[in-house]
Amino acid sequence: MTGGTGFIGSHLCEALIERGYHVTILVRPDDDTRWVDALPLARALGDITDKGSLTAAVRDVDCVFHLAAILGAPDPQLYFRVNGEGTRNLVQACLESPRPPRRFLLASSIAAMGPSGKHRTYNEEAPCRPLSDYGKSKWQSEQELHRLDGRLPWTIVRLPLVFGPRSKGGLFPLMRVVNKGIKLRMGDGQTNVAYVGDIVDGMIAAIESNNTIGQTYLIGESPPYSWKEIMDAMARSMNRRAISIRLPFHLLYLISPISMAIGWLRRRRPFLHLRNVAYLRHRYWRVDTRKAERDFDYTSRHRLADGLALTARWYSDQHLL
């Protein structure tokens, strides 16, 4: 597994081990491994941007989960080097292995499709028109699999806005604001969301099914929520009475570079990244998950309120709220 030390990846490691799988994660020397240090798994030293370092990592593995990606790159070209070329390196290492993996799952993003617009709900057949460099790089990573012509059995899952314990991005900055008694009004947009546990279950179900080979899937909770519904659910999850404040997007565009600079200086994830503002600015990210429900019985066990309650409790226990 690549990205096994991260937010989603560490939860995936736990779930796979609980199911009896033997897990090997790709790690770099400077990776923060706190979430997986106590798990009975193997580690392979390597980096997806260095193809030569991947040879040993993919040797004698049955399945590959490719979750590693860069989200907040200071240089736009890093998105394509890590997300696009990194996927190509990993795929080539798999193909050159004496015993190539039987399955390969890529964790992509709805950013690879671009926003749906107010009156559409995207499914997997919708044309991809990514707007951000991140979205374009994830689209590039998907194309690396489409070029394989059956040489490696692959599956792509496109993830929506994922939240849950251990996340320092996504909904976490908004939850911190709500915890201070403020609900931001961000227009009438809608987006699909997903609790991390449901995403993990979905990825495992997808790679265990023979129906999913050569297919792309949208997974997450359906139907989408309005941002007002999300903000209200956050306040309830933390038992907070919050006032609604309209925050103009042009102000967010002014704040985000300052937040990014402070984050870079402090070597921490910025409170507000320009990529997040762009995501919010294009307000409608509506997707249809029925193909996943049909092909491998995907379901979201956690509704937004349930997932936020679990998430808020974890943040509180970690003294992050």
What are these regions (language model features)?
Residues M1-R19:
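N-terminal Rossmann NAD(P)H-binding glycine-rich loop of SDR-like oxidoreductase domains
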Residues R88-D133:
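Conserved Rossmann-fold NAD(P)-dependent oxidoreductase catalytic core, especially the SDR/UDP-sugar
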Residues W139, R151-P153, F163-F172, A206-Y217, ...:
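Glycine/proline-rich active-site loop of Rossmann-fold NAD(P)-dependent oxidoreductases
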